[in-house]
From Swiss-Prot:
This is Ankyrin repeat domain-containing protein 62. The gene is ANKRD62. It holds the Pfam family Ank_2. The lineage of its organism: Eukaryota, Metazoa, Chordata, Craniata, Vertebrata. Residues 265-367 are annotated as: Disordered. It comes from Homo sapiens. PANTHER family: ANKYRIN REPEAT DOMAIN 36-RELATED, ANKYRIN REPEAT DOMAIN-CONTAINING PROTEIN 62.
Length: 917
């Protein structure tokens, strides 16, 4: 249990370190942490996706295109991270720098790929962004596309020149990263691009080793199909098969061992086919020569047969080959020792040959039974390699048998033995022909499967091309839509500006109307004054006949009349000038209104054209998209059917493969690996137990020492506490006695004062004074005793304090640590105080600004009052031109109606355009 607990603790430690270091590869936290205080105006607009504000900040020169915020980020980086393609297109069109990096050395393209903003990334790639820039972790944009398993993005990056062999700080290429992250679809896509399969990471691991270590069987299968090296080792000397065995991934181990066995069988097939051709040609020549062959030729043939039999039996079992070779050696030895003039009977020799023939037939049956037994173990019905071996075995045995017959035929001519041998040879020939036909059928099937695979690969490549073309067309359509939206925004801005100009013109017309009113009022007043003067003149003339004495008054009135006429003439001139100015301004405004109408008509026409073009493009692209979607569904269905046929064909191919050599090799490797693992496990367990015992004993000793030290310190602390309490009590008693002494001294002083005042009474108190002095003496003696006791207690306390100092020294370390933490807290408090002071300063500034605003407000109020006074004067003058105003009002109302109609039409068209979009 202790070993298990320590093992779990070690695992927890490793997990903790892994959690600390998991962010070191750069694939976590793709977005930015945004705070408003770190951003400028252009950065806020880029995050919000407001193209107009971005344009305003650039046109007003508040920010530059490539300005950075406080976190070293440009507007392009923030727009790509937050997925704002309109802002990205605008910034790219204004020719900002595309390859500027942030604090982690990441470009805008890397951020767009990392945040899976494909539209932004495609805009950057089309305008020449570099796809091979590496960040501080050594990752390129392709690495982040692989981590997100975004195949379309990876295809675009590779199309624009991304390096498929670029390495990160861990030494991972794109293929190694996809395998390590278990991205199966991405691995299949990258293998089509033919990457370097021999690439290794910083630990010397290939893609196959990483796949076997992670337990991804489909990735291992794909890599084995591309003929990856199975025997590569990492830094620790482990192969992919070793990792599969250690992690108990039996399926992966079986696939790798089968791949090795297939390689060995192919090499054996190639060597055996060459030897079969040589043997068949030599056998035909020997049969043509007949029974006239000599003794050395027989020896050579027997040696060849022995070599052939050794090769076949070595693949099946080693023991049978040794027995057979011994028998063949005995036969050769007997043939060599035989003389031409021996007198042995032919029957004995025939018996020996029959015995040897029986042995060969028995060995042949043994070999076949062993082959069938191994086939039953591996559940294989029949493969091409097995049939080739079956072809070789009977042929070699038949050749041995024919050699024996030819050797025996030189000395005996038994008809029965010859007929038996002919029947055996005919049966063997038939079996060989049947097996050859079976092999030819298998070859034809294999070629058909190869042709099907090539056709499927072509279809897959064509589908990939069509997909890439469709994606490219989609991107072009999106670009055009973005451009059209941008044009519409510009047109809307122009329309808004025209409306603003129109509103300004209306305001100016209102001002002119007010001026006309004032003028009309002035005219009315002047007319009234004229009428009153004329009435006065009439009255004066009527009275002139009656009163001669009023002649002087008439003269005065005549002068006044003359002056009034001059004023009236002057006022008429002013009215004429005002009318002339009003006519000129009216003409100007009419011209401006006509120009605005023409501009509105042009804008309406352009809007109609744009709407028509938009509707046409949208319908066209929708039709193309529907067609492409239909084609894509058809191709996907065909692909699924072809994949099913491929899987069926692959299963058939696997059923035709041989696993004989792999079974034997796997058995040996299993036994050796089991032994090694058991030994290593036992050694590690022993070492772990030994270390655990040492650590436990050391911990127990330390805990005992700690408990002792704690007990001693607690005892000393209690003693110190008691002594301090005793000291406090004694000091309190001394203070009380000192207070009593001070009181008695005060009483003595009072008594002396009374004695000086009242001498006769003094005699009465002499005796009392003596008694008091006696009491004082006693008190002083008690005080001395108490002081001695205090000194003794202090000495004891000093001795105890010396013992406590040692304990306090130990405690001071902890106190220092606490003080350090307190200092840190004080520093934090200082920082907070600084922030508070800054906030106070800002508050003061705000109050000052508030006061300044109040001053400005007062000034504006004064100006408003002056303007009101002026307005009153103008109103007085505008009353004169009221008749003109009525006509202008009618015209203005008609213009307003027309403008309202125009606005409603424009709004309807804009709503229609938005609906179509």
């Amino acid at each position: 249990m202790e070993v298990r607990g320590s093992f779990l603790a070690a695992c927890r430690r490793r997990m903790a370190t892994w959690r600390k270091n998991r962010d070191k590869d750069g694939f976590s936290n793709p977005g930015y942490r945004v705070r408003q205080k770190d951003l400028g105006m252009i950065h806020k607009a880029a995050i919000a996706g407001d193209v107009n504000k971005v344009m305003e900040s650039i046109l007003l020169r508040l920010n530059d295109l490539n300005d950075r915020d406080k976190k070293n980020r440009t507007a392009l980086l923030l727009a790509c991270a937050h997925g704002r393609p309109g802002v990205v297109a605008d910034l790219v069109a204004r020719k900002c720098q595309l390859n500027l990096t942030d604090s982690e050395n990441r470009t805008a393209l890397i951020k767009a790929v990392q945040c899976q903003e494909e539209v932004c990334a495609s805009i950057l790639l089309e305008h020449g962004a570099n796809p091979n820039v590496r960040d501080m972790y050594g990752n390129t944009a392709l690495h982040y596309a692989i981590d997100n398993e975004n195949i379309s993005m990876a295809r675009k990056l590779l199309a624009y020149g991304a390096d498929i062999e670029a390495r990160s700080q861990d030494g991972h290429t794109s293929l190694l990263l996809a395998v390590n992250r278990k991205k199966e679809q991405m691995v299949a896509f990258l293998l089509k691009k033919k990457p370097d399969l021999t690439a290794i990471d910083n630990f010397g691991r290939t893609a196959l080793i990483l796949a076997a270590r992670n337990g991804s069987t489909s990735v291992v299968y794909q890599l084995l199909q591309h003929n990856i090296d199975v025997f590569c080792q990492d830094i620790s000397g482990w192969t992919a098969e070793d990792y599969a065995v250690a992690s108990k991934f039996q399926a992966i181990r079986g696939m790798i061992s089968e791949y090795k066995a297939n390689k060995r069988c192919k090499s054996l097939q190639n060597s055996n086919s060459e030897q079969d051709l040589e043997m068949t040609s030599e056998g035909e020549q020997e049969r043509l020569e007949g029974c006239e062959s000599s003794q050395p030729q027989v020896e050579e043939k027997m040696k060849k047969c022995r070599n052939k039999k050794m090769e076949v039996s070595r693949n099946v079992h080693a023991d049978d080959s040794d027995n057979y070779n011994d028998d063949v050696d005995e036969l050769i030895h007997k043939i060599k020792n035989r003389k031409p003039d021996n007198h042995q009977s032919p029957g004995k020799e025939n018996g020996e040959f029959d015995r040897l023939a029986r042995k060969t037939s028995n060995e042949k049956s043994k070999v076949k039974s062993q082959i069938y037994f191994t086939d039953d173990l591996n559940d294989i019905s029949g493969s091409s390699e097995k049939t080739s071996e079956d072809d070789e075995l009977p042929y070699s045995d038949d050749e041995n048998f024919m050699l024996l017959i030819e050797q025996s035929g030189m000395e005996c001519k038994d008809f029965v033995s010859l007929s038996k041998s002919k029947n055996a040879t005919a049966a063997c020939g038939r079996s060989i022909e049947d097996q050859k036909c079976y092999c030819e059928r298998l070859k034809v099937k294999f070629q058909k499967m190869k042709n099907n695979i090539s056709v499927l690969q072509k279809v897959l490549s064509e589908t990939d091309k069509t997909k890439s073309q469709s994606e490219h067309q989609n991107l072009q359509g999106k670009k055009k839509l973005c451009n059209l939206r941008f044009i519409l925004q510009q047109q809307e801005e122009e329309r808004i500006k025209a409306e603003e100009l129109y509103e300004k013109d209306i305001e100016e017309l209102k001002i002119m109307e007010e001026q006309y009113r004032t003028q009309t009022e002035v005219k009315k007043q002047s007319k009234l004054t004229l009428k009153s003067l004329e009435v006065e003149l009439k009255t004066v003339r009527s009275n002139s006949n009656q009163n001669f004495h009023t002649h002087e008054r008439e003269r005065d009135l005549w002068q006044e009349n003359h002056l009034m006429r001059d004023e009236i003439a002057r006022l008429r001139l002013e009215i004429d000038t005002i009318k002339h100015q009003n006519q000129e301004t009216e003409n100007k405004y009419f011209k401006d209104i006509e120009i605005i109408k023409e501009n509105n008509e042009d804008l309406e026409k352009t809007l109609k054209r744009n709407e028509e073009a938009l509707t046409k493009t949208i319908t066209r692209y929708s039709k193309e998209l529907n067609v492409l979607m239909d084609e894509n569904t058809m191709l996907n269905s065909e692909l699924q059917k072809e994949k099913q046929s491929m899987s069926r064909l692959e299963t058939e191919m696997e059923s035709y493969r041989c696993r004989l050599a792999a079974a034997l090799c796997d058995h040996d490797q299993r036994q050796s690996s089991k032994r090694d693992l058991q030994l290593a496990f036992q050694s590690t367990v022993n070492e772990w137990c030994h270390l655990q015992e040492d650590t436990n004993s050391h911990i127990q000793i330390l805990s005992q020492q700690l408990s002792k030290a704690e007990s001693t310190s607690s005892g000393l602390e209690t003693e110190l506490h008691y002594e301090r309490e005793a000291l406090k009590e004694k000091t309190l008693h001394i203070e009380h006695m000192q207070g009593v002494l001070s009181r008695t001294q005060r009483r003595l002083e009072d008594i002396e004062h009374m004695y000086q005042n009242d001498q006769p009474i003094l005699e009465k108190y002499v005796r009392k004074q003596q008694s008091v002095e006696d009491g004082l003496f006693q008190l002083q003696s008690q005080n001395l005793l108490y002081q001695q006791q205090c000194n003794d207690a202090r000495k004891k306390a000093d001795n105890q304090e010396k013992t406590i100092i040692n304990i306090q020294v130990k405690c001071e370390d902890t106190v220092e640590k606490l003080q350090a933490e307190c200092r840190k807290l004080e520093e934090n408090n200082k920082g907070l105080m600084k922030e508070c002071t800054l906030l106070k300063e800002r508050q003061c500034q705000y109050e000052k600004e508030k006061e300044e605003r109040e001053v400005v407000r007062r000034q504006l109020q004064r100006e408003v009052d002056d303007a009101l006074n002026k307005q009153l004067l103008l109103e007085a003058m505008l009353e004169i031109s009221s008749e003109r105003r009525i006509n202008l009002e009618d015209e203005a109302q008609s213009l307003k109606k027309k403008l309202g109609q125009m606005r409603s039409q424009v709004c309807m068209k804009l709503s229609m355009s938005t609906v179509t979009l």
